[in-house]
Amino acid sequence: MSASIIAIILSAAMLHAVWNAIVKTAVDRTTTLGLVALGQVLPGAVMVSILPLPSIESFIYIVLSTLVHFAYFFLLGRAYQHGDLSVVYPIARGIVPALVSLWAMLLLGEVLPALAWVGIGLIIVGILLSNWKALRSGVGKTTLGLALGTGFCISIYSLVDGVGVRLSGNTLSYWAWGAFLHLFIAGLLGWHKRKTMVQLPLKIWAVGITGGLVSMTAYGLVLYAKNFAPLGAVSALRETSVIFATLIGFFVLKEGNWKRRLGAAVLMV
């Protein structure tokens, strides 16, 4: 893997952690997530107007991915209401490789090597380490459950998009339609928070939509990198975002227990 591709993947990882930090710091996270979704619709609309259609077979996967993304947004917002960025994000992202491996075993009949089971075990240890004190007192169970649910959704839409993009015949078109269909997520969240939305200052609108643009850019960089490097290597390096999120949590959001949480994040990576 070339140095330029490594830099692109690390940039994507950092950007993903940044837009999650934007959501975490918002006063009304549901409203902000609606704006993040809207921020993906705008460039998506431009792209679908100039790119060829993906294959008809892939549209069911685009729609299914959109539905799972709605659940993902809902759980992510709730998780950040209850827990720190440096706890929620590493758990939600950290369990994805383990879950995808399990889906491959259960649905595709792949046999997991012993090293993969060791990796899954380390992820579990990392999750327990990041939440140890809270779990002992009982206050971290809600955060853990929501973070795990968020990670479950990520693993499902990753699997769906992995199949769908192969059927699409055009990676950019698949990506663009996925972004454009966030219109439904933005619409549902916007209707739910319609009174709040009309009263928001322009600064909040700008921050939320910027988060959407950052999110879409991060995903686009990963898609680009996958054209030039093995998928497994890209995915593994992509998970360095959990370290970026932990560092943002400590240096920017002033969250505590950063040494233990950073150690847990590194362990999960």
Language-model features, listed with the residues they occupy:
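Hydrophobic alpha-helical transmembrane segments in multi-pass integral membrane proteins
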Residues: 44-54, 100-116, 153-170, 214-232
